[in-house]
């Protein structure tokens, strides 16, 4: 469904990579484009074409009301009063993913979830590539979706956030999944159900819905085209035979888990979801197997950062919410003590789910950052520090062979770092001093 934007007054809210991709797309379609960014010095302003008007520091209500169409950044809530005023005036408000879906002609595999979505997106793209198809991977990971339209692709694999899905209506995915749902972005949503409903939009018009059999929140009433993944009682499941675990597609053995470079139960679940998505999109099993063997995983996601003196230092800085840390801790094999680094900005989440997992005699918690106090209250074996560096300096002398130091903070990083990547890099730097 291609739409004409010629001479339409379109206001793009939010610059950065995604905003610029919207501007470039709309200019190529001969739209009359204006840009608003609530920041006084927005990233990407210097790359904006000089003939495009830019308003910074606030939402320009007059510009919004003069628009035929508003393209909203996923970072800005639709509930914002100025946006509600525009909607009440009958002005359409959509996001960059909706623009993309109206234009894309090739099959789309769509992935969302509170945790694991970047890993699954990258793994599925690897599977599509292994089948000899030209894959366009983007959305909430790497390249903005609209930028993918600049080159020819056979298939698109998109990671989508709840924020992006809120303003997407025309997505008709070949296969789609909500990997899991746990509290995240509670500072943006009324409650968990509000957040869940945003995620479930990914299933609307999908040919195949891939559902987590272990997470009832990922299921949607009335779905007739679903397949499931989970440890057991699912279409895609784990089979254990003679001490080895195997990834299964219904009755067919896909691969032994120990043949993958990905480790940990949560990654076996990610692999099962990826197999289901790829098979539903027609990717041959042999290509899927090859991709599973080759895939190295992603940085800052349960990544071995350093190994010295028998101690493993594991960087899981991408664990920016409780569910992600729960996934890292579930089924974790330990020989010695786990030194767990927790803390940062909890985004209003309820941390209580962690309590039963971390209240173990072989787990010591080192809590830091904005919500460190709240996290330290979960376990009597917790210590409180201002920064991650202070915590690491305190735990370093206590380490013994067989121990693991795990950064899986259950929080966003922005209280003390520019990004989860910077936090992970700093952890790795400190680990290598050992």
Swiss-Prot record:
Predominant cellular place of this UniProt entry's protein: cytoplasm
Signal peptide residues on this chain, from the entry's feature table: none
Keyword Isomerase recorded: no
Domain of life, source organism: Bacteria
Listed GO biological process terms: cell division; cell wall organization; peptidoglycan biosynthetic process; regulation of cell shape
Record key words, sorted: ATP-binding, Cell cycle, Cell division, Cell shape, Cell wall biogenesis/degradation, Cytoplasm, Ligase, Nucleotide-binding, Peptidoglycan synthesis
Pathway: Cell wall biogenesis; peptidoglycan biosynthesis
InterPro entries hit by this protein: Mur-like_cat_sf (IPR036565), Mur_ligase_C (IPR004101), Mur_ligase_C_dom_sf (IPR036615), Mur_ligase_cen (IPR013221), MurD (IPR005762)
Pfam families hit by this protein: Mur_ligase_C, Mur_ligase_M, MurD-like_N, NAD_binding_7
Residues that bind ATP: 113-119
Entry's localization field: Cytoplasm
Transmembrane feature ranges: none
Catalytic reaction annotation: UDP-N-acetyl-alpha-D-muramoyl-L-alanine + D-glutamate + ATP = UDP-N-acetyl-alpha-D-muramoyl-L-alanyl-D-glutamate + ADP + phosphate + H(+)
Protein family membership: Belongs to the MurCDEF family.
Function: Cell wall formation. Catalyzes the addition of glutamate to the nucleotide precursor UDP-N-acetylmuramoyl-L-alanine (UMA).
Name of this chain's protein: UDP-N-acetylmuramoylalanine--D-glutamate ligase
């Amino acid at each position: 469904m291609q739409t004409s934007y010629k001479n339409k007054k379109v206001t793009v809210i939010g610059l950065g990579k995604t905003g610029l991709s919207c501007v470039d797309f709309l200019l190529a379609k001969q739209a009359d484009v204006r840009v608003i960014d609530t920041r006084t010095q927005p990233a990407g302003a210097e790359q904006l074409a000089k003939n495009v008007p830019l308003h910074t520091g606030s939402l320009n209500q007059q510009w919004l009301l003069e628009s035929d169409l508003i393209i909203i950044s996923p970072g800005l809530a639709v509930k914002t009063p100025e946006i509600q005023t525009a909607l009440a005036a009958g002005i359409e408000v959509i996001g960059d993913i909706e623009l993309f879906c109206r234009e894309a002609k090739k099959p789309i595999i769509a992935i969302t979830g509170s945790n694991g979505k970047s890993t699954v997106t990258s793994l599925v793209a690897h599977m599509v590539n292994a089948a000899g198809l030209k894959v366009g991977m983007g959305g909430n990971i790497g390249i903005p979706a609209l930028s993918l339209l600049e080159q020819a692709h056979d298939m698109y694999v998109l990671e989508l956030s709840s924020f992006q899905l809120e303003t997407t209506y025309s997505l008709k995915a070949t296969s789609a999944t909500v990997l899991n749902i746990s509290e995240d972005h509670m500072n943006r949503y009324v409650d968990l159900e509000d957040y869940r409903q945003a995620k479930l939009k990914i299933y609307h018009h999908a040919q195949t819905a891939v559902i987590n059999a272990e997470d009832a929140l990922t299921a949607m009433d009335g779905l007739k085209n679903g397949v499931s993944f989970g440890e057991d009682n699912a279409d895609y499941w784990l089979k254990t035979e003679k001490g080895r675990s195997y990834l299964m597609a219904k009755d067919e053995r896909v691969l032994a888990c120990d043949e993958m470079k990905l480790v940990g139960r949560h990654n076996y679940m990610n692999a099962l979801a990826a197999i289901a998505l790829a098979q539903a999109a027609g990717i041959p099993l042999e290509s899927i197997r090859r991709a599973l063997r080759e895939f190295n995983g992603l940085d800052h996601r349960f990544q071995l950062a350093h190994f010295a003196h028998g101690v493993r230092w594991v960087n899981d800085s991408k664990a920016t919410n409780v569910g992600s840390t729960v996934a890292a801790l579930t089924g974790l094999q330990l020989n010695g003590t786990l030194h767990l680094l927790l803390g940062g900005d909890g985004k209003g989440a309820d941390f209580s789910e962690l309590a039963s997992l971390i209240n173990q005699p072989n787990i010591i918690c080192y809590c830091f950052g904005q919500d460190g106090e709240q996290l330290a209250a979960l376990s009597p074996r917790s210590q409180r520090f201002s920064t991650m560096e202070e915590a690491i300096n305190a735990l370093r002398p206590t380490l013994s062979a067989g121990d693991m130091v795990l950064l899986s903070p259950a929080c966003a990083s922005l209280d003390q770092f520019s990004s989860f990547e910077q936090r992970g890099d700093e952890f790795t730097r400190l680990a290598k001093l050992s």
